[in-house]
Amino acid sequence: MFDIAVIIHDSIIINKYIDFSYINVDKYKFLWEFEHDWDQIEDESRMINVFNDLELKTFYENKDLWKGCFGCMTIIRHDYLIYINNKYDISKLLYYVLDKYNRQSFERVIACLLQKEGKKEVLLGNIHKYCNWGIPFNEIDKCKNLPVIKYWTGR
């Protein structure tokens, strides 16, 4: 059991010590957010509709109320994660997240679920303002000033 989880993925480098015990996390905190410039409305709506929740669908459709969570990378309290899962059963999305396109939609859907139930908080701001987009691994030395580095690989 854990009180707080830090969810990151494999193309992330924690470049400086981060004392998470000093980061105030009421319910959750995204590592990075992003705007709605690249929404995939049809795919996202298909996922949102799985929950059969009109209030959630209305919230999702009002793009002024929420932003995406880059890579779904989040600091989240265990009790809040349990609350979200009990309310929405996020495992319903397993059948819908099958490829990169769906994973990008999931970044918006999980962000929507978290923000509908709790005020949005972000640790590092907007990913598109935080660092240069598309930093390859062999250039991460140019980002030593950043506490967390996101790099891109060609898979």
What are these regions (language model features)?
Residues 1-155:
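ER/Golgi luminal nucleotide-sugar-dependent glycosyltransferases, focusing on the catalytic module
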